[in-house]
Amino acid sequence: MAQNKPNAFMAFVADWRACNRFGRGLSTSEAVAKCGPIWEGMSDRERGPYKSKAKDSNVLERESKTERLNCPGVAFSKMQVEKNEAIDAELQMKRNIKRIVLKATNSMKLEEEEFLFVSFNYFTKALNGDVYQPAELSACRFSLKGGISSNYSTMINPGHIIFGQTSDAQDHSRTTHKLPLPPNAMGEKNLGNLYSDTLKWLSASNDEEDEQYDHPVIVYTTPELMPVVKSCFRYLACEGDTDKHAKKIIVYDICYLFLTLKKTVLDLVGVPSDHMNIHVTNSFFRRDFFEFSSGIACDYHEEVDRTKYCTKSMVLRWGYMISHYICGDLAIPLQPRKHVPIEVKHSYTVTPGDSSLALDGTSTDSGYSGY
């Protein structure tokens, strides 16, 4: 049996039921019987809005029938729009990273330019949306010359696990960070205060221009963690007094930052950089040869032998990796705890010059000029 097309009278019935407290308790047939006499007494002018609404509904129905859908019922056109938006966002991110590095280079402050690295652990991910429930947060402030100057780390107790996700959360915790689940989770329970404190710490390095024009805070993480970091910041922001701060944190790809820095530094010292690409820098991060360094994780993950998954260890290792592959080209001496873990000996020596950008700094047995 063919489905009846929307008509003006039924549009009126739906509107009457929505606006009439008595009508909400009636069935459709009862509402039709009640509205019949009212409809008959209405003029063409009064019926006009309902005729327009019915016409619009018929047009939308015809369009939906001709629209191609995928298996879950999502229109291909909508998927294409989302794909184009993602491509545009990635291109904008790359342009902004290049602009940041170029600005620091032109002002002769590339070595002092500070970058913020952020990582999250999570308990579970919602099945029907891009929502990650945060479990641990760490961030560090990094520059080529000073290495890691400060770090921020905290565990998070959201109070409860997303309904129906306890088993998934247990599996994820057991195979990764091994943090106890809510309500027995460790760390901060007031997520609103935690978000405010985190935003305050991240904003501490903003210069006068950033404060004057209310520029967003830019943080960097790995491509795999970008959706996690974005979602966890949104989760914390929703618990705050206001959501207006959510737009103040932008998450960028640390691998592309690494690529941009490396190519820029090689150009500065006159070394060809054509062989450098995103696949090379991604392989450096996947190699992660500081993964098993001791003394860089939080006390809890050191105790349970899960230092690899500790967010504090992650952000410190990212700083160490960038230092390892770039500082030698700029003749910057590696300082323990700032550029490398305290027990690691770097594989090159630096001959001091008038400036760390001077080319009389030499690198031996390091392979920096080759990468």
UniProtKB/Swiss-Prot annotation:
Keywords in alphabetical order: Cytoplasm, Developmental protein, Differentiation, DNA-binding, Meiosis, Nucleus, Oogenesis, Repressor, RNA-mediated gene silencing, Transcription, Transcription regulation
One term under GO cellular component: perinuclear region of cytoplasm
Cited Pfam families: Maelstrom
Primary residence: cytoplasm
GO MF, one example: transcription cis-regulatory region binding
Location relative to the cell: Cytoplasm; Nucleus
Source taxon at top rank: Eukaryota
GO terms under biological process: germ-line stem cell population maintenance; male meiotic nuclear division; negative regulation of DNA-templated transcription; oogenesis; piRNA processing; regulation of miRNA-mediated gene silencing; regulatory ncRNA-mediated gene silencing; spermatogenesis
Record-annotated DNA-binding residue ranges: 2-68
Ranges in coiled-coil conformation: none
Protein family membership: Belongs to the maelstrom family.
Function: Involved both in the piRNA and miRNA metabolic processes. As a component of the meiotic nuage, plays a central role during oogenesis by repressing transposable elements and preventing their mobilization, which is essential for the germline integrity. Repression of transposable elements is mediated via the piRNA metabolic process, which mediates the repression of transposable elements during meiosis by forming complexes composed of piRNAs and Piwi proteins and governs the repression of transposons.
Protein name in the entry: Protein maelstrom 1
Organism annotation: Drosophila pseudoobscura pseudoobscura (Fruit fly)
